[in-house]
Amino acid sequence: MKVEELIIDGFKSYATRTVITDWDPQFNAITGLNGSGKSNILDAICFVLGIASMSTVRASSLQDLIYKRGQAGVTKASVTIVFDNTDKSNSPIGFTNSPQISVTRQVVLGGTSKYLINGHRAPQQSVLQLFQSVQLNINNPNFLIMQGKITKVLNMKPSEILSLIEEAAGTKMFEDRREKAERTMSKKETKLQENRTLLTEEIEPKLEKLRNEKRMFLEFQSTQTDLEKTERIVVSYEYYNIKHKHTSIRETLENGETRMKMLNEFVKKTSEEIDSLNEDVEEIKLQKEKELHKEGTISKLENKENGLLNEISRLKTSLSIKVENLNDTTEKSKALESEIASSSAKLIEKKSAYANTEKDYKMVQEQLSKQRDLYKRKEELVSTLTTGISSTGAADGGYNAQLAKAKTELNEVSLAIKKSSMKMELLKKELLTIEPKLKEATKDNELNVKHVKQCQETCDKLRARLVEYGFDPSRIKDLKQREDKLKSHYYQTCKNSEYLKRRVTNLEFNYTKPYPNFEASFVHGVVGQLFQIDNDNIRYATALQTCAGGRLFNVVVQDSQTATQLLERGRLRKRVTIIPLDKIYTRPISSQVLDLAKKIAPGKVELAINLIRFDESITKAMEFIFGNSLICEDPETAKKITFHPKIRARSITLQGDVYDPEGTLSGGSRNTSESLLVDIQKYNQIQKQIETIQADLNHVTEELQTQYATSQKTKTIQSDLNLSLHKLDLAKRNLDANPSSQIIARNEEILRDIGECENEIKTKQMSLKKCQEEVSTIEKDMKEYDSDKGSKLNELKKELKLLAKELEEQESESERKYDLFQNLELETEQLSSELDSNKTLLHNHLKSIESLKLENSDLEGKIRGVEDDLVTVQTELNEEKKRLMDIDDELNELETLIKKKQDEKKSSELELQKLVHDLNKYKSNTNNMEKIIEDLRQKHEFLEDFDLVRNIVKQNEGIDLDTYRERSKQLNEKFQELRKKVNPNIMNMIENVEKKEAALKTMIKTIEKDKMKIQETISKLNEYKRETLVKTWEKVTLDFGNIFADLLPNSFAKLVPCEGKDVTQGLEVKVKLGNIWKESLIELSGGQRSLIALSLIMALLQFRPAPMYILDEVDAALDLSHTQNIGHLIKTRFKGSQFIVVSLKEGMFANANRVFRTRFQDGTSVVSIM
């Protein structure tokens, strides 16, 4: 809110209506002679703001505010301020929708004042709240700075300066709340002491006496209850025991009679069964004799089996040799490939070194040639100068010959420069002839280039559209090729799978879902397909197969419920054994036993389960099958481990021999054919490959269908793209064949040739300079020689010796480089030759590998054929053997069963005799017990309810009955003694006293809790006050120093705590003038002290800015330069607030944006704008 217009009518020296408009929103100054009414404008503003202290507006009563106290015909004083309220963020509460706010205060002679807001009458409190909401509280006017306030600040003590900071921070309110809380706490403490005294001196002694009496009464009640309970327990136990014995004997009698009847029937039935079984035995013996008289079919089948086994052994031996040859050749091939790769790398390295050495050798040779030429010329010169004839016998040597040669070279270089210059001139002339056509050609070419660009952009857009649709022609081709490869691979893998499937037929497990929502994941599968053997452990396959035995084809399921459902409703096609994970019990070999076994035979023993990989979910099944057997390398190790006293575990050798700690040994001759478990592993791997290939094939097929569908959708775009590509090709051809393009190309060629000529001229000019220098040098040497032949000749001889030495060194270097060059050349040729030889050898090895693979494939096919025949023969042989074994097994079973029946019959007869004797004894005991039970019922009525008796006995199970009888006697004696001493009314008396005690303790606890909360509140208030005070002090002292430095350059001031005290105990002003800190403000001049006070006031104003500030001649004690600094400070630092300043000094109002001048005319004040 900013002052926009001030209307004064009848207020103090303004007798008539005076309107002061065009107030600046930032800096306004009022000036004029003393007594002209300057300060009356400020008084009028304070009057409207609702000032209550008349002394502030220099009046003793409201009547003094009317012009000449109403004696000049003016009977009321009225002041109106119109505020600009366009800044909604700083608007008073409830006035955000008013762009202007008009506030009027009137005082009538002899009456009271009234207020109007926007022309409507309003109570004084509403006006005060309006201004307080925008920090214009006239009754605590921080925004009003009178001259006297500066003097007051100068004389403030540290505690008073701290009060200014507290006022700015707003922590006075915290002091009031703290004092209130301390008064409340004092009252609470008094009440607390009263309650504690009452509790200690009156209630607690009385309560202690009553509690002693209560304890005695409770003890009496407890004794009475224990006595009744103990007597009931003793009687219940006696009755229950007798009753239980009686019932037990009765049941025994009934069961004995039933059992006797059953035994008689069993003996009779068993005799009949034994007779029947003897007849069956005789019949089976006759059948066995008939089977033994048949021809020797088994012998023929065994001979045929041995022949097939020998053939398989021979073929596998051949295959093994072939495989070894193949592996050996493959290893050699790999070694050759590695050697070829290494040799190729070395050859590249040698060739690189050879090229570098060749380059160095040529450079050295060139330098050597130049050095020899220089030496030869020097030698000829010395010879000519010495003898008149050169070393070659020519008479035209010496300086003259060298000078002639140098001049010839100089002429040749000059001629070359002229030729290049002439060529460049001709090119420039041709360039001038092309230039007129170049502009038109460029323009025409730009059109062609633009056309090519447009065609290219069209093609790019069409390609982008195809990409958006996800269509890629090359992708379809790649997918089609991949689909063909996957199909071929799939058919071949399926063929291999079918072959292996015939060899492992028992792996098939098919079932129908027992019910629709059957959880298929609960059926884990056949054991043989649930684990894998790593290639490193494949040699253990026979041992692991022996370890698993028939369980290899068992089916693992999650629980017994799943197993039951499969057996009852799964429609299984063959008999299977199911392993439910929740029912099997495992006893795997412990880690300690395994460690001991490995220590006894290091590297030769391992737990079977550790040689396979499987899913964690079926760990229990794998432990059940493989967890209790050790795999050993050889029979010696197996014996050592199996029969060790601390191990005694089942062991299996790699050949499949089983060693049992009970002394059983099984094994011997086994098939030499490949292990069934290896076939199962191969079959499992191939099945996984088929699944992977099928998934890849499905993915490729889906992507192909997507691409075909996209191709149909984008046919139009593809046609447009082909057409655009054709247009682009035509446009490029047109661009290349266009004469304009040829002109531009020729222009570029000429510019390039001109550049080459310029470079050649520069190079030749450098050579020309060298030739000129050489001519000058020779001429200079000739002059020196003519003037002093002896000295010059000696100098030339020295140079010749030095050149000879350098030539010798360079020749040595040349020879060294040549030797290195030749060595590298030989090494490179040798490496190249070796590489060619190795490549030829590798080619031969690869041919051998292919040949061996074909031979191996043929052998494997033959082996598979023979193995198939072997399987057929073995099946027939097993069936024949099984028929004989079945007869023997059946005969043994019948004989065992007869023996078992005879034993059962004998045992039943003995049991029958004993039972008759016992029954007679039990009948005599029953009558005695019935008499005792009847006596107890008559004595204790509660025994009629046997359920109650049973519950009593159950609750006190395991007690010592004799101890309880003794305890019952002691309790009865104690009960009779206590009955004489107790007070039966004690419970009612103690209840009232305890309630009073509890109420007092609750009250004390509540008061202590309230006291603690008050203390916490005071502590929090002190912490918050200090934090707020420190932040305010830090901000104010910073602004204080900056403002003082602006007012008095090269100076600084700050607020600091008194020496040795905290910031909350008082603040004092420290001033630095130049580089010297002043000990006291007394050392400062009056103007400097005024600046200090004014800087502090301005810093406080800046901490919590108000929308308007009123300053009344605050610069009275300052010189002109300081006054000007204050004006500048207001203008630069307080941009968000409106200042109204009364000043007589030009330095102040020269900085103001608006200056009002007052003057006294005809007895009234008049205001004008400067």
From Swiss-Prot:
GO terms for biological process: cell division; chromosome condensation; mitotic chromosome condensation; mitotic sister chromatid segregation; negative regulation of meiotic DNA double-strand break formation; rDNA chromatin condensation; tRNA gene clustering. Residues 172-469, 678-1027 form a coiled coil. GO terms for cellular component: chromatin; condensed chromosome; condensin complex; mitochondrion; nucleus. GO terms for molecular function: ATP binding; ATP hydrolysis activity; chromatin binding; DNA secondary structure binding; double-stranded DNA binding; minor groove of adenine-thymine-rich DNA binding. It is found in: Nucleus; Cytoplasm; Chromosome. Transmembrane segments: none annotated. InterPro entries: P-loop_NTPase, RecF/RecN/SMC_N, SMC, Smc2_ABC, SMC_hinge, SMC_hinge_sf. The flexible SMC hinge domain, which separates the large intramolecular coiled coil regions, allows the heterodimerization with SMC4, forming a V-shaped heterodimer. Present with 3290 molecules/cell in log phase SD medium. Central component of the condensin complex, a complex required for conversion of interphase chromatin into mitotic-like condense chromosomes. The condensin complex probably introduces positive supercoils into relaxed DNA in the presence of type I topoisomerases and converts nicked DNA into positive knotted forms in the presence of type II topoisomerases. This is Structural maintenance of chromosomes protein 2. The lineage of its organism: Eukaryota, Fungi, Dikarya, Ascomycota, Saccharomycotina. The gene is SMC2.
